[in-house]
């Protein structure tokens, strides 16, 4: 995994290969799935591999505290308008933070600032339902 993270900025292709290798060895590693998502979706989030990798990161480690913030920030930037599964993951993650992990609300604020318009509306709706305000 270390190779994938170190290559992510300079060589997405090398990072993709490193994360793919890691997943062959450990297919339930949420961190490897999370790394594969930006490596394969750098320029095209409609890329099925990127969105599948992001989903697998959630499915294999939804509550991994080390991934909650960066994964939420990445998900907020993705075009979720054509993928109800990603919308559901965004809603569930925000709701979980509001109800069970208030110490991570800062991550929601960060995600909100970089979110697409559609994802901002989703985040706003979750906070409105909880009768809370979105953190700065």
Task: Please state what every model-predicted region is.
Residues 4-12, 23, 37-48, 77-83:
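Short coil/turn linking the two alpha-helices of tandem helical-hairpin repeats
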Residues 21-22, 56-57, 97:
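Canonical positions in the second alpha-helix
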Residues 84-136:
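Terminal, low-structured helical/coil segments at or just beyond the last alpha-helical repeat
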Residues 3, 36, 71, 107-108:
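Structural register within alpha-helical repeat arrays
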Residues 27, 62-63, 102:
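Short coil turns that delineate tetratricopeptide repeat
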């Amino acid at each position: 995994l270390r190779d994938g993270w170190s290559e992510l900025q300079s060589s997405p292709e090398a990072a993709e290969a490193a994360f793919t290798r890691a997943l062959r060895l450990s297919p339930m590693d949420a961190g490897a799935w999370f790394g594969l998502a930006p490596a394969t979706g750098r320029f095209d989030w409609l890329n099925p591999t990127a969105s599948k990798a992001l989903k697998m990161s959630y499915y294999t480690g939804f509550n991994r505290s080390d991934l909650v913030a960066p994964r939420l920030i990445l998900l907020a930037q993705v075009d979720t308008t054509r993928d109800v599964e990603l919308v559901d993951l965004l809603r569930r993650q925000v709701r979980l933070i509001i109800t069970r992990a208030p110490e991570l609300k800062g991550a929601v604020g960060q995600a909100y600032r970089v979110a697409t318009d559609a994802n901002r509306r989703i985040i706003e709706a979750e906070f409105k339902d909880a009768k809370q305000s979105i953190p700065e």
